[in-house]
Amino acid sequence: MTAPQRYKYLLALDFEATCLKHQDIKPQEIIEFPCLKINTDTFEIENTFHYYVRPVHHPQLSDHCIDKTGIKQENVEHALTFPEVLQLFEIWMETEGLLKTTYAFVTCGNWDFNVFLRNQCRTSQVCILPSSN
């Protein structure tokens, strides 16, 4: 028997962003926005959200970035911009009923939220996602 869960869903996020080898890139931009919706009762993946994101400030991916992330230039060249993808993610969350239940974002460390998302929202001049119930 499993213990009752505090959250109905876990939303697993793992952003990928522009990068250079041995140097910083400013601003670093999110180029992949994936999310898994995991039911905490069954631990099954109920749905996924996945979009590539077109970088605006550094539209050409470095060879290092392509090698490190596996994302090709053609994946991002005609992709939507971050504000457009963020809006689609908010719609997806609403469509999935997430705004009417409890959920928690899950990432590997704090880099995705505290660095990638925060900086991308600042660069794109958009607000960060709504908080969980």
Segments the model singles out, each with a brief description of its role:
Residues 120-132:
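A short alpha->loop->secondary-structure connector
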Residues 2-114, 118-120:
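Conserved non-catalytic scaffold segment of RNase H-like nuclease domains
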Residues 7, 132-133:
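Short, well-ordered alpha-helix to beta-strand connector turns
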